[in-house]
Swiss-Prot record:
Binding site for [4Fe-4S] cluster 1: C27, C31, C34
Protein residues bound to GTP: R20, R75, T106, K167, R270, A271, R272
Name of the protein in its database record: GTP 3',8-cyclase
Family listed: Belongs to the radical SAM superfamily. MoaA family.
EC number(s) given by UniProt: 4.1.99.22
Cited PROSITE patterns: MOAA_NIFB_PQQE, RADICAL_SAM
Oligomer and partners: Monomer and homodimer.
Binding residue positions for S-adenosyl-L-methionine: Y33, G79, S130, M201
Pathway: Cofactor biosynthesis; molybdopterin biosynthesis
GO annotation terms (biological process): Mo-molybdopterin cofactor biosynthetic process
Length: 341
């Protein structure tokens, strides 16, 4: 068995460096831009347990991505990852993998008061919490379940108290929550957490995306600069998706993820593994590659490694660049709740 780490690049010379694992397609929220309640109702056919990759299967795949391809970062997503039973057990398995330097999780934060300490003890390093408003009634409307913003704020504080790194992501939509840009910036500036604004993206097929509803990075930063001046700073690492800005008074930083106005396809090094076990090479992909079938089909680690490498070598995705060139109209895409953000 060949256990040597090798560099694999795609058709555009982009290396594989980052793995995102969706552990469930279920969520306890029904956010309008991700899992709108009218489409994801009580009769929606969510994946059954046997359809999900088991923790042992996920561990095996993670070991290959880290040991064979040199992946150093794994992010756990959903749906809402904490809806998957016994998540600390999966994190323990991942934390034992030699060479894996960073284990992160994207979550809506509502279950962190229960799980934050257990996640930290298991080996999780940091969380990114999705929060789109501090105004309670607006937040309840956005999450579609009437969950109070206080529940998420409690989760953020629980994560901080447990010693987890914390960042906040806010999806900004014109006509929905642009009034929250400044209150969110002020609040998390005072709390000492990095807030990242995300341009409203056309992920999936159900969020009624229209470019007119996008508030761009330039507009967001211009608004903040009028009240709390910032200056741009360099990325932490090659391929970082957020543009970083530092407050001039030295009180921290913010970021903007601007997939619509600034395509970052050229440096994208992320592979995404869905809860069903399909490998996707782009957040905006139409289809994935059935890795679960290979895992359950008796392939050796060497054979599985070569199959994954072949998928990456043939990757040509550059959806955000194509969008800017109006080459994506009518393209059907996988839903974000299935592939993870």
């Amino acid at each position: 068995m060949n256990t040597e780490t090798r560099r694999v690049t795609d058709k555009r010379e982009r290396p594989l460096r980052d793995l995102r694992i969706s552990v469930t397609d279920r969520c306890n929220f029904r956010c309008t831009y991700c899992m709108p309640a009218e489409l994801f109702g009580p009769d929606y056919p969510f994946l059954q347990k046997t359809e999900l990759l088991s923790f042992e299967e996920l561990e095996r795949l993670a070991k290959l991505f880290v040991g064979r391809f040199g992946v150093e970062k794994i992010r756990l997503t959903g749906g809402e990852p904490l809806m998957r039973k016994d998540m600390p057990e999966l994190i323990k398995k991942l934390a034992r993998i030699p060479g894996l330097k960073d284990i992160a999780m994207t979550t809506n934060g509502s279950l962190l008061p229960v799980y934050a300490e257990k996640l930290k003890q298991a080996g999780l390093h940091r969380v990114t919490v999705s929060l789109d408003s501090l105004e309670d009634e607006r937040f309840k409307a956005i999450n579609g379940r009437g969950v109070s913003v206080n529940k998420v704020l409690e989760g953020i504080e629980a994560a901080k108290a447990a010693g987890l790194g914390v960042k906040i992501n806010m999806v900004v939509q014109k006509g929905v929550n642009e009034k929250d840009i400044l209150p969110m910036a002020r609040y998390f500036k005072e709390k000492g957490h990095i807030l990242r604004f995300i341009e409203f993206m056309d992920v999936g097929n159900t969020n009624q995306w229209n470019k007119k509803d996008v508030i761009t990075k330039a507009e967001i930063i211009d608004l903040i600069n009028q009240h709390m001046p910032t200056e741009p700073i360099e990325a932490n690492y090659k391929g970082e998706v957020a543009s970083r800005f530092r407050y001039l008074d030295g009180s921290g930083e913010i970021g903007v993820i601007s997939s619509v106005s600034d395509a970052f396809c050229a440096s994208c090094n992320r592979a995404r593994l869905s809860a069903r076990g399909e490998l996707f090479t782009c957040l905006f992909a139409s289809s994935g590659y059935d890795v679960r079938k290979l895992v359950r089909g008796g392939l050796t680690d060497d054979e599985l490694t070569e199959s994954i490498a072949s998928v990456w070598r043939n990757r040509t995705d550059q959806y955000s660049i194509d969008r800017a060139l109006s080459k994506t109209d009518g393209k059907k895409k996988v839903e974000m709740s299935y592939i993870g953000g």
